[in-house]
């Protein structure tokens, strides 16, 4: 609602969600600080400078972690979806480019002000991790990142550099291989094999067909410890009942692949 003042109704909804996850045997990857719809971002938040913005983000995560601390349904806290930093020139907007009407990518700073990118990233990660750990010492923390090594050959991990990601529990990276470039994606994935468990946190046949994505998943098993993908709240059976359409066919194939190839779980996160 305001800096340092969490929205109590939203926290109550989170409690309901967590309880539902416990009852249905689901694990939650709680990804925070999303500003996907620019028009819904509070004006006061958008106007904050870096120091106050980080402070507010820390308050946010402390409130979330307090709610989730005792639940076995929490898989992890993901600090922010695809955070980025400015270049040499000062940026003017916290949100990066729009894609499909949404802003998935967000800056954690507008100006490096003489700092290295590693210094800024480490300070941000450490501040938010500390806020979570004051409330929850149990659950894992990660940051879902864009695999820049796929776009810029030779690029090294930023948030998972040794001096930056020390307090992150596992690597989360997002991959959408292009048609004919599965081997390139696998090579880029290897860059993020830094000695921590590695999860491909996002994937979907967005830029290639399902057979190529399936090959990427199979061959990435040499490096990755887990995979998660998109689920928009509709079951496989609901898509099967739809009138034929490209969207329904794509989602039907995807959910069928994921269900068929997902390993069986040995237990569910039910609260005792």
Predicted feature locations:
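Low-complexity, intrinsically disordered/propeptide-like segments
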Residues: 20-23, 189, 258
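Charged/polar, solvent-exposed surface patches and flexible loops
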Residues: 59, 102-103, 187, 191, ...
């Amino acid at each position: 609602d305001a800096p340092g003042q969490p929205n109590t109704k939203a926290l109550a909804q989170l409690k309901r969600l967590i309880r539902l996850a416990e009852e249905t045997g689901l694990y939650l990857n709680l990804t925070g600080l999303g500003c996907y719809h620019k028009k819904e971002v509070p004006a006061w938040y958008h106007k904050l400078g870096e120091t106050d913005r980080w402070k507010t983000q820390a308050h946010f995560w402390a409130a979330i972690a307090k709610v989730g601390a005792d639940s076995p349904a929490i898989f992890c806290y993901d600090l922010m979806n695809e955070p980025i930093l400015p270049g040499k020139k000062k940026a003017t907007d916290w949100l990066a480019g729009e894609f499909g009407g949404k802003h998935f990518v967000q800056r954690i700073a507008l100006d490096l002000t003489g700092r290295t990118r590693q210094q800024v990233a480490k300070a941000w990660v450490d501040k938010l991790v500390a806020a979570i750990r004051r409330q929850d010492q149990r659950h894992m923390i990660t940051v879902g990142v864009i695999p820049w090594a796929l776009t810029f050959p030779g690029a090294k991990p930023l948030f998972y550099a040794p001096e930056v990601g020390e307090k992150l529990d596992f690597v989360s990276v997002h991959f959408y291989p292009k048609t004919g470039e599965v081997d390139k994606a696998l090579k880029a994935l290897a860059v993020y094999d830094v000695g921590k468990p590695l999860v491909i946190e996002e994937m979907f046949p967005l830029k290639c067909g399902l057979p190529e994505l399936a090959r990427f998943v199979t061959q990435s098993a040499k490096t990755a410890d887990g995979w998660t993908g998109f689920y928009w709240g509709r079951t496989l059976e609901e898509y099967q009942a739809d009138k034929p359409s490209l969207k329904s066919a794509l989602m039907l194939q995807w959910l069928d692949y994921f269900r068929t190839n997902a390993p069986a779980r040995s237990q569910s996160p039910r609260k005792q």
